[in-house]
Amino acid sequence: MSISSTIAPDLQAICRTALSRDVAASAPIGTGRNSRVFRVELSDGMRHEPAQVVVKFYRRDAGDVRDRLGTEFGTLKFLWQNGMRSVPRPIAVAPDRECAIYEFIAGEPVSPGAATAEDVDASVAFLAALRQLRGARGSEAVRPASEACFTLGEIVASVDQRVARLRSATSAGDDVARRLHDWIDATFAPLRDEIVEWCARTAGSCGIGFDDPIDREARTLSPSDFGFHNVIRRPDGSLAFVDFEYFGWDDPAKTIVDYLLHPGMALDDRLKHRFAERALAAFADVRSLPARARVVYPLFGLKWTAILLNDFLPERASQSDGDRRTTQFANARTFVAGLAGAYADNAFLS
């Protein structure tokens, strides 16, 4: 590793203050839209701390009130205090610098399409372990997950809010933006209305009120952004789960269908069936969960379509080029075509 000249002074100051150790070397290991992450090799010092750590810097966007730093560090502290070791250990936090220090977990990402049945089972086991913590010490302080929705109406509202922002952003844009705007009117909006009507009718037949919140005891602790894109395979083959910026209480139906719908997961149908079957069994204590998951699946499919189109939003304009927006528009159209043809006869949740 080599020290980054632009960040080394910050890393040095942070590690000296928090760990009483100097940085010997550092290297970036991830640059997301909401954070910068560095692997840091430490010099000799406090021997009870590891030789390598992760330093994560969090960004705060204007108008976004979510405390990603506080949520992630607090979550990992809560999980470690309750015996969970499949997540990084939180070591130190520096709120004034919007950063935290975590255990470095050696391993490799789980590549899209490379997941195994055992990996899916480990994912279910992790969600089941979180479910068991719903009454654990400290759970009462956990807030709702980012964009948690506890009624069907709240899901629809979150979809409509995202689409309204896309309409506003694309109404006077370039050619690809105008084509997206026209596609929303001609294709997405009619499908949205069709799906909402189907969901309301199907939910009613299952005794699920459109605006009735799920019971508190049915809610579960959820990473909210859960999938193999946030997993490290350790050298011994076991999985470690990372990225808890959006963690909190959520509807287990959302947790399950997000795993199935996430565009980056690249799970084949066999693994999707396996996950759905085993996840529903792990949450067998949640009344009407199979029916609820089937109902919310297409609603979250609409939301994932809007998420795929985030590059068209004004706050992403400086980070997205025309080629990427064109690609994401094509991906969204493909995603919607698959959703339109299968939502009423869901092969994974039937």
Which sequence ranges carry the predicted segments?
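ATP-binding pocket architecture of kinase catalytic cores
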Residues: A27-A172
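An alpha-helical support segment within catalytic cores of ATP-dependent transferases
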Residues: T6-S20, G135-S224, D285, L289, ...
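Extended, well-ordered alpha-helical scaffold segments
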Residues: D119-A122, R179-W198, F275, D321-G338
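ATP/Mg2+ or Mg2+-diphosphate-binding catalytic cores
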Residues: W304-S350
